[in-house]
Amino acid sequence: GYMHSIVRNVNISNCVILDSNRSLCIMSSTDGIVENVTASNLRLDTRCRAGNWWGNGEAVCIMGTYHHLANYRDPVPQREAHACIRNVLLQNLNCTTENALAVVGENGSVENVHMDHLTVQLKDSENLCVKGRVIDISPAPNTARLPEEPTWLYLRGVRNVTVTNAFVAPFHGKTPIAYAEDAEGARF
């Protein structure tokens, strides 16, 4: 769904992704559409790398943020859809990650995301301080800054994101938090 394309009816299952700067990314500009995506039975392990790489150690990053490159080959289409990413099911994910799982939109541009049966284990990072405590939402012009507390889930600008049956392991003796801002209908 990068830039303005349309992606529908995607199924990702039974995958192992190890030592990745970002494991699972679903992204679209607000003028694209990504819908009806299921990802299940995944083992995701990330680490943040120094340098200018997309991703900042996120095991899951779903982002529907406006970005348009003036030199992109196609003009911005006029679409009627309110949400550019919708109807996503993430099920049976085992995540070992240096950063939070993230669902980031603008004004509800990401909606109806359900995560079920998650295991999340945060781990120490040598390089997270290089980019800062942020979710990498490149190429969007804005940022997604994390709270100072250990954070396992970051939601912003989304609608109807639900999490059920999640186990989040303690990190340095603390229970990581779930952070939500402008997240209508979020339940976790």
State what each model feature region is:
Residues 1-188:
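Extracellular/periplasmic carbohydrate-active domains that bind, remodel
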